[in-house]
């Protein structure tokens, strides 16, 4: 099986200042990679370099990003438009970064569909309903007829996830998708992401500073420190037997709770 995403010797930043350097990794179809590290380590910059989402652009100085056999960094405008949103979707930390507060939720789903496909209203409604059902969202009409600010934070984030998987993307880039949520809703969202991986074979890169989230969700973990990957491997191996001094210090800072559970500091 060929990798879905290959990043090779990637260095990127802003205004001539390098933030991430010499990043190399691969992501297989259906695999979840957790990227952990302290604030300022370059986690979000890595996603921005891959995403090409409007407003998230960063400057790539060296390296290549290959997605599904295509050179992601040198696609023309039409290829990028097709790829972003349909084959690669982005889940932001805060739902407000994804949802327009002046438009009802239903309209935003319609706009996403029509940006990539020609569909009648009935077909769109059926597609939306099927996605809501897949991730366990009930009371569909109430949600679709609401404005984003009328939804709770947890519900809004679940709507964002539904919007992200609407067109069955091959890759989801998630930037701290649960950090703004309470613990109960966090687990619910994580379970929904795992279910999407299992049912749709969607690959994901999940940025988090919460080791518990990485342990629960990721197949593999990459540890970022000062813009570079210092350790990467299977989640259990990296988190239970860290080799790099920074990874060891990161794990030592995680409070241990009863029953072997871990909680974000």
State where each predicted segment sits.
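Conserved ABC transporter NBD signature motif
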Residues: 59-71
């Amino acid at each position: 099986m060929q990798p879905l995403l290959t990043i090779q010797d990637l260095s990127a930043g802003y205004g001539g200042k390098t933030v991430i350097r010499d990043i190399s990794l691969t992501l297989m179809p259906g695999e979840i990679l957790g990227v952990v590290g302290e604030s300022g380590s370059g986690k979000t910059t890595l996603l921005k370099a891959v995403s090409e989402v409007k407003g998230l652009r960063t400057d790539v100085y060296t390296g290549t990003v290959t997605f599904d056999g295509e050179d992601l960094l040198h696609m023309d405008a039409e290829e990028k438009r097709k790829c972003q949103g349909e084959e690669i979707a982005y889940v932001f930390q805060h739902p407000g970064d994804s949802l327009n507060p002046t438009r009802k939720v239903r309209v935003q789903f319609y706009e996403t569909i029509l940006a990539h496909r020609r569909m009648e209203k009935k077909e769109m409604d059926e597609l939306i309903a099927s996605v809501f059902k897949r991730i366990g969202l009930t009371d569909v009409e109430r949600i679709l007829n609401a404005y984003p600010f009328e939804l709770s934070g947890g519900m809004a984030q679940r709507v964002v996830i539904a919007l992200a998987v609407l067109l069955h993307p091959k890759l989801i880039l998630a930037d701290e998708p649960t950090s703004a949520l309470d613990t109960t809703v966090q687990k619910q969202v994580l379970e929904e992401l795992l279910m999407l991986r299992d049912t749709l074979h969607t690959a994901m890169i999940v940025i988090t500073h919460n080791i518990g989230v990485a342990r629960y969700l990721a197949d593999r973990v990459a540890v970022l420190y000062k813009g570079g990957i210092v350790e990467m491997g299977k989640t259990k191996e990296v988190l239970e037997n860290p080799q790099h001094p920074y990874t060891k210090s990161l794990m030592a800072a995680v409070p241990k709770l009863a029953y072997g559970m871990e909680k974000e500091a």
